């Protein structure tokens, strides 16, 4: 066993389970490493101007005062950092708190330079309350306010929130050049490149290439056969759970088949105006390096008056192949390294995670599964990890 647990600060098991999985996600670990120099300069500036002592709602104002009153004495780096802080201080302070916690979660493993082995150090539980406090404060009055109100909440919502904040903390403008032979290439790829440029040229970060990916939606008119195409950026894929699959055990592939099946859609053809029996097909267009799956276990009755939890056992593999759902031709396989489980009922359950520690290369994983249940961390067998009836979210890393 080589991992810190996390204290539960009042129904924060959803957050703890998500943080444990993020802390062993290769894209997240590398994200934290590549910004070390930039972050050192950021912390120095925050310390120099005592911005860390400011309330979150006054930091932007303080940055503006410094820029107005001390501009002549500031270095170019300080000008850039203060300008970024004025624009995105909320996201940046969440990032700083998140990074500090993730580094501590990873600090239970250190390399012995004499024999290149990994030694164990103190594994006392860690407290995520600094991250909880700042996210709660900054979410106040927003659509995310209920996420940090002390009630049982959803790790998927927390992941979507924190990933967006991390992206915003490093978001910048870049020049994205389209190929000179744009009109000669495949039409779908052309549309993808144009959408990518429009969406990310002024909002680009490390996450765009490492955690985000595109899903393509094609709608075909049943009458004139015109095809309308849209591209949607995505970071977490939410897949339905079939109620029955020929009396057999449900697998993750059954869920993916349901997600990516050709279906009818209410749609008015932009070419001929036909509304009847139009078909939609979805596929993954750009290959994600991190493939996070949410199983839609929470469902509503037909009349929509009540919600219930689907407790079906869903079989998931150690190696996931998504070739069938991907537009590319190359083999696309993923390695399972994290699972968020939910036990209990819809209104009174508990979240915990299974994870594999990431190796020092930040690409591969230790083969020992660990159960992280708030402060408690214990070894579990492969059989136990791979047969959880409580599996709710699955974390896969691209095998390159």
Report residues per predicted region:
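Exposed substrate/partner-binding surface patches
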Residues: 1, 7, 19-22, 50-53, ...
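USP/UBP deubiquitinase core
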Residues: 1-185, 292-294, 380-399
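Beta-sheet entry/capping signal
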Residues: 12, 218-220, 290, 352
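Short, surface-exposed loop/turn motifs at beta-strand boundaries within globular domains
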Residues: 12-14, 214, 286, 346
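Beta-strand elements of well-folded, non-transmembrane domains
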Residues: 104-111, 118, 217, 286, ...
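Active-site-adjacent bridging/hinge elements
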Residues: 125-137, 191-198, 330-331
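A broadly conserved sequence feature marking short terminus-proximal activation segments
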Residues: 143-247
């Amino acid at each position: 066993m080589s991992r810190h647990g996390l204290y539960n600060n009042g129904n924060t098991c959803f957050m703890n389970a998500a943080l444990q999985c993020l802390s062993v996600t290769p894209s997240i670990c590398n994200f934290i490493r590549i910004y070390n120099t930039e972050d050192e300069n950021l912390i120095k500036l925050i310390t120099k101007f005592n911005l860390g002592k400011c309330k979150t709602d006054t930091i932007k104002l303080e940055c503006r005062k410094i820029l107005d009153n001390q501009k002549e004495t500031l270095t170019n780096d300080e000008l850039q950092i203060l300008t970024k802080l004025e624009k995105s201080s909320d996201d940046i302070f969440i990032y700083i708190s998140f990074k500090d916690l993730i580094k501590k979660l990873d600090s239970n493993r250190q390399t012995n330079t004499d024999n290149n082995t990994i030694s164990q150090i103190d594994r006392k539980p860690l407290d995520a309350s600094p991250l909880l406090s700042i996210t709660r404060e900054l979410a106040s009055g927003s659509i995310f306010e209920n996420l940090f109100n002390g009630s049982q909440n959803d790790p998927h919502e927390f992941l979507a929130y924190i990933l967006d904040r991390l992206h915003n903390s490093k978001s910048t403008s870049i020049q994205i050049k389209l190929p000179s032979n744009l009109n000669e290439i495949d039409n779908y790829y052309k549309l993808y490149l144009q959408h990518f440029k429009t969406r990310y040229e002024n909002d680009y970060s490390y996450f765009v290439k490492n955690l985000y990916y595109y899903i393509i939606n094609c709608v075909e008119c049943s009458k004139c056969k015109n095809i309308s195409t849209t591209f949607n950026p995505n970071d977490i894929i939410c897949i339905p759970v079939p109620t029955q699959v020929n009396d057999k055990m449900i697998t993750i592939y059954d869920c993916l088949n349901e997600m990516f099946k050709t279906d009818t859609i209410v749609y008015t053809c932009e070419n001929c105006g036909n509304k009847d029996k139009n078909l939609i097909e979805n596929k993954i267009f750009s290959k994600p390096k991190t493939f996070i799956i949410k199983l839609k276990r929470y469902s509503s009755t037909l009349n929509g008056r009540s919600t219930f939890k689907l407790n079906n056992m869903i079989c998931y593999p150690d190696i996931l192949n998504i070739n069938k759902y991907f537009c590319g031709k190359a083999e696309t396989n993923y390695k399972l390294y994290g699972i968020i489980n939910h036990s209990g009922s819809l209104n009174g359950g508990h979240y915990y995670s299974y994870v594999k520690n990431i190796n020092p290369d930040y690409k591969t994983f230790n083969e020992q599964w660990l159960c992280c249940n708030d402060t408690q961390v214990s070894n579990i067998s492969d059989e136990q990890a791979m047969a959880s009836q409580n599996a709710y979210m699955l974390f896969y890393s691209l095998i390159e």
